[in-house]
Amino acid sequence: MIHRVDRLSENSINPITGNEYDNSWIIFMLTDSLDYRQMSGSNNACAYTIKVSRKQYKNWKMAVGDFIGYCEANKKNAILVMSEENLKSARDHYEGHRYNEPLLRDSEPSVLVHSTPMNSWKQIKSDGMLKSWNMLKTEKAISEEQPIGIWLGDPTDFSDYIMFGGDVTGEIIVNSKQQGKIIMDINTEYLTGARLYFDAERMARDGFLVRDGCHLKVKNMLPLKPYLIWAATWETIGLVSQISTPRIFAEQADKQFQSILQDYNSQ
């Protein structure tokens, strides 16, 4: 069920139930912050919260609509932190859209990036597809007890999805997995894996893309063909060693990908 409140204090007490949050709850908070467009996570024992700034993100109404659609489809308990006026404005603007509509919006990136450790990349190639953490765990293909998203406060059902990002985010995740804790320093050395570039337009058209108000993701599995455009590894981008930093690996891979993308788009 989806609830709306005008304001919310980020602490462990759920304003709807009066009790502590359990993992079934998720929050969408509309702000006027100048410090970010979108951000997500859990602070001060509060439920997982997606924050979207009206001042910095012009597509905030679409984000609200996607969040509502995602929560309704997955029967999640959700809290919208915004005025009734802003909620009505978002609903009116979103009319005719769906959180999983099979098209890529003008505001969405044409390429989605997923980063993975090298040993996982070998398994992905063997399987011919990406799989969610929960699917891999069910198949006993991984030994880790919990996904890294748990450290970030992710809801448990997020492990049903393959997450995508851009910039250096994926490399931060790979490095953090290796270190067993969240490492935000993009200049620390780590063992590079594979940085995978996917055709987002084709993924959307074929019904794979899911939007939750903050992320673009895919549920359960994604075949490599015909969606994978290119896989960057330390060898394919010309590094002298598998050891690098998240910043260098991401920058070098993205730079080389631009020429590959031009060839791909001209086909």
Which residues make up each language-model segment?
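Hydrophobic side chains in beta-strands
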Residues: 115-117, 166, 198
